[in-house]
């Protein structure tokens, strides 16, 4: 909050006229000063800015929103939340009161404020005033260079550069030959020379002359390039360099004129430092970046998370002891935050006006406590407001203050508690209890989202399969019903065809039977006629027999016997021919039955082929296919 509220508070002080706080603020912001150097007679000495975190005197008012409801005994967070709060201009050091981390840092650096007792009669000590700068602002301008001088905030690396240059010069002395030194035409003994005289070297004079005529913005232009002055009339003399690549070239040159290049790097780097341009320290690679430290900063926090609520006592009873807020009442005042329990501190005089809200022992609980602490700080109801400019009453009701609890706070809370009545707590690592758990929660949420998406896809797939199954089941049901109807009709047709075939068989058998009966009747009639004819011939012969004539009798007997023989012979021929006819008939019947069986076989085969084509047409494929 200090970074946001500081400019606002400064504007208010300036508008109100001269105040001592303005002078202190100006002195606190003075991070750089210029002093004359004892070595070079007029060089600029760069002093790094140091942050001074100290409490200010800006005061703020807490405005309680008007409410038509009956006034309550305490003005809680609900009243200050929607109001126009001017107390947000408190000077708070660190990252601000918005998180527990900044509060822990502020509390650890303010031992005096924590060693006192938390009671309503405490008055904050006046802020410590820092002495003015020694000698004021030490401005000493040099002629001809003031218009190019700019003060920048950067680390003092001149000593490191000089040490590195000396080491490189020593190592280069072993590498350079006499020929190189002669060709350099350069006096290497420059320890007693000033910076100005080193710039007037015949190798560098023209280069630094053009460099001095440019401003810092022009020097840092990316399109501006130079030749290396140490490479004149030698290899690399035609190469162009920007400012920082030229400085890197002079630092890393390892062939001819090594010492001259190192001297150029030293003079150029020192000149850039004096003019306030950005310089890369010697030994670092051009284009290298530096980020935050690898080690994560950690600190101890109170566990379970707790928020101290101050100014919770109300009035004295008949025994001259203080009465205060109850547990449920305190929870109701902060019902928007997921606090689990509330406790109050009691002493010999009764309620001490100090209460605590206890949250869940998890990263979520710590975030809830930190959220309450941050919102109280935004409304100017935090630790600093309670310690420096507390307002016990606001709009006729008691104003509540709150902040994250520390070990010192809870020790004061337990000051008059013994045994089981003491509030138990532990000191845990912030990284271990909050950061790691939040990371684990984040990973679990990612896994949860992954499995949710996976489950959603599976549910969609299952729904599609279910719909497809319903459609296929309906088709199967209809197909089964159609097959049942077809089978029923086929069965009925088969029964009808069987009845017709049976009728045809019966008609056929009856017809054959009639034929056989007529045939048998004809054969019987034929035999009967043959017997009658024979009997007739025999009877006629017997009637014509005359006993008187033996010759005639013998003759008649011979005629009868010859007739009988002839008739028997004819009958034998008839029987033979009849048997031949029967055999021919049987053969014809066998041939006919054979043809009939073959026709039946062909019909069955054709029926199987037609049925197979029908099944293939309706999707019933063979497994071998």
From Swiss-Prot:
Set out the biological process GO terms recorded for this chain's protein: defense response to bacterium; defense response to virus; heat acclimation; miRNA-mediated gene silencing by inhibition of translation; negative regulation of cytoplasmic translational elongation; regulation of defense response to virus; regulation of photoperiodism, flowering; regulation of siRNA processing
Q: What happens when the gene is disrupted?
A: Early flowering and bolting at room temperature (22 degrees Celsius), lost sensitivity to heat and accumulation of FT, associated with reduced levels of TAS1-siRNAs. Attenuated immunity leading to an increased susceptibility to the pathogenic bacteria Pst DC3000 (avrRpt2), with slightly reduced induction of ICS1 and salicylic acid (SA) levels upon pathogen infection.
Q: Report the principal subcellular site.
A: cytoplasm
Matching Pfam families = XS (PF03468), zf-XS (PF03470)
Cellular component GO terms held in the UniProt record: cytoplasm; cytoplasmic ribonucleoprotein granule; cytoplasmic stress granule; endoplasmic reticulum; perinuclear region of cytoplasm
User: What keywords does the record list, in alphabetical order?
Assistant: Antiviral protein, Coiled coil, Cytoplasm, Host-virus interaction, Plant defense, RNA-mediated gene silencing, Stress response
Please give the coiled-coil regions recorded for this protein: 452-533, 564-615
User: Which InterPro entries does the entry link to?
Assistant: SGS3 (IPR044287), XS_domain (IPR005380), XS_domain_sf (IPR038588), Znf-XS_domain (IPR005381)
**Which GO MF terms does the UniProt record name?**
double-stranded RNA binding; molecular condensate scaffold activity; RISC complex binding; RNA binding; translation regulator activity; ubiquitin protein ligase binding
The secretion signal range is none
* Compositionally biased residues, Low complexity: 80-94
For bias type Polar residues, the affected ranges are 54-70
Impact when changing residue 500 to K: In sgs3-3; complete suppression of post-transcriptional gene silencing
Protein task: Required for post-transcriptional gene silencing and natural virus resistance. May bind nucleic acids and is essential for the biogenesis of trans-acting siRNAs but is not required for silencing induced by IR-PTGS. Involved in the juvenile-to-adult transition regulation. In case of begomoviruses infection, it is targeted by the viral protein V2 leading to suppression of post-transcriptional gene silencing.
Q: Which family does it belong to?
A: Belongs to the SGS3 family.
- Put simply, this protein is called Protein SUPPRESSOR OF GENE SILENCING 3
Q: Which organism is it from?
A: Arabidopsis thaliana (Mouse-ear cress)
Q: Which gene encodes it?
A: SGS3
